[in-house]
A protein has these predicted regions:
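Active-site phosphate-binding/coordination module
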Residues: 44-133
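Non-catalytic pre-domain segments flanking phosphatase-related domains
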Residues: 1-29, 33-37
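Metal-dependent phosphoesterase signature
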Residues: 21-22, 28-45, 100-109
């Protein structure tokens, strides 16, 4: 598809974005650059999405990022995105550069208890799964 085939309002919006001095392009992971699949550990990114993010990250004054509810280490291992693409995990509390907010032991314990309770509910309902994030 060429730019001329895009609706006029989309072309105007793109022209406006292209004039900003610094651009952040951020995308969700699951259901956006990777398909929703029945086994979350197999949600690999689509090649076209990786190529687009890599190209965007290579542009001057442009940062490309992927944000996910997944833990940062899981997002990095599963996505295998190039280092030029910034990764942000745990709904924004973990970054691959700059800083990371560690989850304290009380919060980890609470998360374990919540996961256990939800897993019991899921076990009683066919087709329901719980993914620890």
């Amino acid at each position: 598809m060429s730019a001329q085939e895009l609706p006029l309002d989309v072309r105007r919006a793109l022209a406006s974005v292209a004039r900003v001095p610094r651009l952040l392009v951020a995308s969700d992971y699951d259901g956006t650059i990777a398909p929703i699949v029945s086994d979350p550990s197999k949600a690999f990114p689509q090649r076209e999405s990786v190529s687009a993010l890599r190209a965007l990250a290579g542009l001057a004054n442009t940062t490309a990022a992927v944000i996910s509810g997944r833990a940062l280490r899981d997002l990095a291992a599963l996505s295998r995105l190039p280092v030029e693409v910034q990764l942000i995990g745990s709904h924004g509390s973990e970054f691959d550069v700059g800083f990371v907010h560690a989850i304290d032991s009380d919060a980890k314990q609470l998360l374990t208890e919540i996961n256990s309770a939800f897993s019991k509910i899921a076990a009683e309902n066919p087709g329901v799964t719980v993914e620890m994030k």
